[in-house]
Swiss-Prot record:
This is Putative protein SNX29P2. Belongs to the sorting nexin family. Residues 226-242 have a biased composition (Polar residues). PANTHER family: SORTING NEXIN-29 (PTHR47194:SF4), SORTING NEXIN-29-RELATED (PTHR47194). It comes from Homo sapiens.
Length: 249
């Protein structure tokens, strides 16, 4: 009974060493402290085991240091290469070329827009000229017609049968054609009054020229000059009239 109680005591005791007393294993190293004193062989074994453990630990630490130094050396070598790398210069040139291309595209687009606007303005102006009501002719045609009529009015007094009555009639016909056929604005009242005065004076000059032909024979050159003065009376004011010859009464 005492042996059984003594075997039960280690199980109730606290601490890991108490369990080793109750368990008996074939391996002596695991049985814990033996009752006998340790021999020299046991001490040598333990020392060799400790040495091997130290070697393994030192090898592991050395391998770790080697890996760290290798990684740090690689990082140090990579950094200066990146600083001296010519790639950033190439990227700047490429960016400058891209900017130049963008500016050229913008300039081209602006010119195209201006050309389109000009075409639209020309089309609109053409439509406006087509839509404007009138006599069916452009301003250039009307100006041509008016210039032809005025030249005919100038040329009529210098014809072979140039008299004051004929020139006045031609002026009336031209004025009617300008006022009725081509739809121009009518002449002012002042110009009409001046024309009436000119016609009366032309009649007076015509009668006087008839008397001169009866009394005195004059050359055709003088008649031509007289008709020129009559044409000048039609187109100019009374102040531009030539004085009468001294033989006229």
């Amino acid at each position: 009974m005492d042996e059984e109680r003594s075997s039960m005591l280690p199980t109730m005791a606290a601490g890991p060493n108490s369990i080793l007393f109750a368990i008996n294993i074939d391996n002596k190293d695991l049985n814990g402290q033996s009752k006998f004193a340790p021999t020299v062989s046991d001490l040598l074994k333990e020392s060799t085991q400790n040495v091997t453990l130290l070697k393994e630990s030192t090898q592991g630490v050395s391998s770790v240091f080697r890996e760290i130094t290798a990684s740090s050396a690689i990082s140090i070598l990579i950094k200066p290469e990146q600083e001296t790398d010519p790639l950033p210069v190439v990227s700047r040139n490429v960016s400058a070329d891209a900017k130049c291309k963008k500016e050229r595209k913008k300039k081209k687009q602006v010119t195209n827009i201006i050309s389109f606007d000009d075409e639209e303005d020309e089309q609109n102006s053409g439509d406006m000229f087509k839509k404007t009501p009138g006599a069916g002719e452009s301003s250039e045609d009307n100006s041509d017609h008016s210039s032809v009529n005025i030249m005919s009015a100038f040329e009529s007094p210098f014809g072979p049968n140039s008299n004051g009555s004929q020139s006045s009639n031609s002026w009336k016909i031209d004025s009617l054609s300008l006022n009725r056929e081509f739809g121009y604005q009518k002449l002012d009242v002042k110009s009409i009054d001046d024309e009436d005065v000119d016609e009366n004076e032309d009649d007076v000059y015509g009668n006087s020229s008839g008397r001169k032909h009866r009394g005195h024979s004059e050359s055709p050159e003088k008649n031509g000059a007289h008709s020129v003065t009559q044409a000048g009376v039609q187109w100019h004011d009374l102040s531009s009239l030539q004085p009468l010859p001294p033989g006229f009464k």
